[in-house]
Design a protein with these regions (language model features):
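Bacterial extracytoplasmic/cell-wall-associated proteins, especially those involved in peptidoglycan
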Residues: 134-142, 153-362
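Signal peptide-directed extracytoplasmic domains
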Residues: 30-206
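A broad, low-specificity signal for short, low-complexity segments enriched in glycine/proline
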Residues: 6-10, 49-54, 277, 288-291, ...
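Short N-terminal secondary-structure initiator segments
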Residues: 19-24, 41-56, 120-126, 158, ...
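N-terminal type II signal-anchor transmembrane helix
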Residues: 3-41
Length: 362
């Protein structure tokens, strides 16, 4: 009787041990099944259709090797009371694991397979902007140029943005929105978005960078003048550290009634985008309210009629926080990107002759 009782106890103990081992093994397997399939970081595009059941979602994830086991995925969903998985197109990786995948499915997809990323560099003009947009969207070059000069559109912008003023009504401006579109990388919903949609994004970004200067004491200048100056500084200065000093040079010359003498404004006036092309004497003398190289006195003490390129935050800050000095001239070594500043013309001319061979063609 005692032997039978002992035998029963041993059997029961064995059963309990086996159950414990089974539970532990199951838990280990379950936890392992929830882990990442591999260490791969390659994106996989999957589509969860509207109305898909949890089982169908599990099958889709397994098909793309994003989960190890459909059953454990379903168990995880049940145990965690998940019932709000969202449909859509997702980018997922094999190294995510079930928890991250479920979190993503609960949050919903932010991935758009039709999304277009478009980049506008600092210091480019409206013609170059038009080329970039026409190459990356369904809009034509002409669509962009026309929108940049659209009077009705400009009227709407005046109501929306404090920095869009009546100065843009000037018919002599090549492109009314030149210099007002902030250079950056933008994400577009698709290639079919309108030029106005793109411009609105760029203008909203410009507003962010100008906001701190909304109540600036402009004295006898306006925001349009500061943007014109900033675009000159953007194009003239190889490095940002020289820009506030360079801005002061132009304003010093303006205060003395001199022409501002900026080569980049002459290049813009002639609509020459080839940076390797040296300007001729005739091009430097082109009669234009953009050309600050004119020697006939018509541009003495005057900024160009408007901005000549996109403008970085560095150049914006430089003109609003210009240095205080007496320099009237500067010249840069194109190769080393070092800029030299002078108070008198003879010293400037000496350095210019010294750098003539280095800067040939610029």
């Amino acid at each position: 009787m005692k032997k039978t009782s002992l035998r029963i106890k041993r059997v029961l103990l064995l059963v309990v041990l086996l159950l414990i081992i089974g539970v532990i093994t199951t838990l280990i397997y379950y936890k392992s099944s929830l882990g990442k399939v591999s260490t791969s970081t390659t994106d996989k595009e999957i589509v969860i259709k509207k109305g898909s059941s949890t089982k169908t979602i599990a099958q889709t994830l397994k098909k793309y090797s994003l989960i190890k086991n459909e059953f454990t995925f379903l168990v995880y969903i049940k145990l965690n009371n998940v019932n709000d998985l969202k449909y859509g197109t997702y980018l997922m990786k094999e190294n995510m694991g079930v928890e991250k995948i479920v979190n993503m499915l609960q949050e919903g997809s932010t991935y758009n397979p039709d999304e277009v990323t478009i980049t506008f560099q600092e210091g480019i003009n409206m013609r170059e902007i038009a080329n970039i947009i026409s190459k990356n969207t369904t809009n034509s070059y002409e669509d962009v140029i026309n929108k940049a000069n659209d009077i009705e559109y400009i009227k709407k912008l005046k109501e929306k943005y404090w920095f869009i003023t009546d100065r843009l009504d000037n018919s002599n401006l090549y492109y009314k929105l030149e210099g007002y579109l902030y250079p950056n990388t933008y994400k577009l919903a698709n290639k079919e978005v309108s030029v106005e949609y793109i411009f609105d994004k760029m203008l909203a970004e410009m507003e962010k960078h100008l906001e701190e200067y909304k109540d600036f004491d402009y004295n006898n200048m306006e925001i349009h003048d500061y943007l014109s100056l900033a675009s000159m500084v953007e194009k003239e200065s190889p490095v940002s550290k020289d820009r506030s000093k360079m801005a002061a040079v132009f304003l010093n010359r303006k205060a003395k009634g001199m022409n501002l003498g900026s080569d980049v404004t002459a290049r813009y006036a002639n609509k020459i985008d080839d940076k390797s092309k040296a300007l001729t004497a005739r091009e430097f003398a082109m009669k234009s309210p953009y050309n600050t190289r004119l020697q006939d006195g018509s541009m003495n003490g005057r900024l160009p009629i408007g901005p000549i390129s996109t403008i970085s935050k560095s150049s914006i800050d430089a003109v609003f926080n210009k240095d205080e000095h007496n320099y009237l001239y500067f010249i840069s070594n194109i190769k080393t990107q070092e800029t030299f500043f002078y108070e008198n013309y003879s010293d400037f001319l000496t350095k210019k002759q010294e750098l003539a061979s280095v800067n040939q063609g610029f």
